[in-house]
Curated annotation (Swiss-Prot):
Region annotation Disordered: where it falls in the sequence: 306-332
Name of the protein in its database record: Fibronectin type III and SPRY domain-containing protein 1
Organism annotation: Danio rerio (Zebrafish)
UniProt domain COS: residue ranges: 105-162
Domain comment (free text): B30.2 box contains a microtubule-binding site.
Length: 495
């Protein structure tokens, strides 16, 4: 009995699910019927509108051509009627003269005959009949106004519904990725004059293969593209790849999307590490503000920290000389910077390759520095004052100056102070260059040999700055590095 009840419950559950499935399908069918009715009305209205437009064009053409025929007829009629009137008057004059000549010829008076003959001769000389052109000024032919609409009629007879556009194909070999721009190039299998525009979709991804059902980033849409290529500019490359697909559209319908194509968008991406920054710095992912009250909220903790760091095991000197394997990392909870080291590090190490990032800072900051540091940078160390960091330093305390600093040596830079600095690091070559990012003017280059991974490093006192990552090394910087490979700007020039 219990088994039968359980079996019946399963049947009831199955029937209920099937009924719900059928009900959902019925709702879907009803919605499809409504959509079909609405779509049919829409396309019928569009069809009637198109034919009305076509009729209007034909009516306008007919009216224009009929008007030209009427104008041509009126012009020729005027010419022929004018010529006819002149000829009629000339004929009347000639007939009168002929009658007068006949009468004179029959006259028996010799005296009057001589004078009359002389007058007739003079009249004939001046008669309009002898000054008229007997060639018609206008032709009666209207053959040049004939028409033959056979070709147009055939075209009209070939009118049909718009075909669905073919699927484009993206040519990976012709696509380009450089200077944070992406150029995508595609073609259609066959030329199609009815294509009105293209729609390009793109999205960021960290997966090289085909798009996944669930991605972290949505498709972004670019509409109204008239050519078979498009360039995205000013893209922040904060993922490893970007996926693209494109479809063609005629006036009324869009075709299928092309096969997605994934392009590599390599760039250096990092965030600022708030966990190890100085407490007077208010740190967001990519920006920092000076906070004078930041270090006062945990006075007791700071005192305990000072007591702990006074021991030989935690002295600044020992911290600065620790082995890289034991050194605190920006990724794994290193000690906070303290005292006058108003420093914040990036959260990503550089141990290979060429990288570029930019920083925009408040030029009214009392002090600001940007560069790179070793993982072993001590928590009391200021940027540029030890052999574990290289930086460019802005000082606004007494007199504004811009200096390059490393290992407590400095060189004043003779240049205008920019508000945005580009930083280029070539780990293998041991090159660290600073640029005015507005015009890519080289400010200074350090040449060294990195023995350990380095980290983006920043310092600010009474000011603020923001970092822009996800940038490729600009091509102008790469070409400039080749030209300036023997530049005198180096560690040796610091004094």
């Amino acid at each position: 009995m219990d088994d039968q009840k359980e079996s019946l419950r399963k049947i009831i559950t199955t029937l209920a699910l099937k009924n719900e499935e059928i009900q959902n399908f019925i709702c879907s069918l009803k919605q499809s019927l409504e959509n079909l009715e609405a779509n049919s009305n829409r396309v019928q209205e569009d069809l009637e509108s198109e034919f009305s437009s076509l009729h209007s064009v034909l009516d306008d053409l007919k009216e224009g051509m009929v008007t030209r025929i009427k104008q041509e007829r009126a012009s020729r009629t005027y010419e022929l009627q004018s010529q006819l009137g002149a000829c009629t008057k000339a004929l009347e004059s000639s007939e009168e003269l002929l009658e007068f000549a006949n009468q004179t010829l029959c006259s028996s008076e010799n005296d009057s005959f001589t004078q009359a003959a002389k007058d007739i001769k003079d009249s004939v000389t001046m008669a309009p009949a002898f000054r008229l052109s007997l060639k018609a000024k206008a032709s009666d032919s209207m053959n040049h106004m004939m028409v033959d609409f056979t070709h147009e009629r055939n075209l009209l007879q070939s009118i049909t519904f718009l075909p669905v556009p073919a699927t484009p194909e993206i040519h990976v070999a012709d696509c380009q990725v450089f200077d944070n721009t992406v150029t995508v190039v595609w073609t259609l299998p066959e030329p199609d004059s009815k294509i009105d525009h293209y729609i390009l979709e793109h999205r960021k991804t960290n997966h090289e293969g085909p798009p996944r059902a669930r991605e972290d980033y949505p498709w972004m849409v670019v509409e109204g593209i008239k050519e078979t290529e498009y360039t995205l500019t000013g893209v922040r490359f904060d993922t490893r790849y970007m996926t693209f697909r494109v479809k063609a559209c005629n006036k009324a319908v869009a075709g299928e999307f092309s096969e997605p194509v994934t392009l590599e968008t390599h760039a250096f991406v990092f965030k600022l590490d708030a966990s190890s920054s100085h407490q007077n710095l208010k740190v967001e992912d990519l920006s920092v503000e000076w906070d004078s009250s930041g270090g006062k909220v945990a006075v007791q903790d700071i005192r305990k920290e000072k007591n702990r760091t006074n021991s030989p095991m935690h002295s600044p000197a020992r911290t600065a000389m620790m082995s890289p394997k034991r050194a605190p990392s920006a990724r794994v909870g290193r000690d906070r910077f303290t005292a006058e080291s108003y420093t914040v590090l990036g959260d990503t190490m550089i141990d290979a390759g060429q990288h570029y990032w930019e920083v925009r800072f408040d030029k009214e900051s009392k002090a600001f520095a940007a560069g790179v540091a070793l993982r072993s940078l001590g928590r009391f160390d200021q940027l540029g004052k030890s052999n574990a960091s290289w930086c460019i330093h802005l000082n606004n305390w007494l007199q504004q100056s811009l200096t390059a600093k490393h290992n407590n040596k400095a060189r004043t830079l003779d240049c205008s102070i920019p508000d945005r600095i580009g930083i280029y690091c070539n780990y293998e070559e041991g090159t660290l260059s600073f640029y005015n990012s507005r015009n890519k003017t080289l400010l200074h280059t350090f040449r060294t040999k990195f023995q350990q991974p380095v980290i983006p490093a920043f310092m600010v006192w009474n000011g603020s700055f923001s970092v822009q990552t996800g940038l490729q090394v600009p091509s102008i910087v790469l070409s400039g590095q080749k030209r300036n490979s023997n530049t005198s700007s180096s560690n040796a020039s610091l004094t």
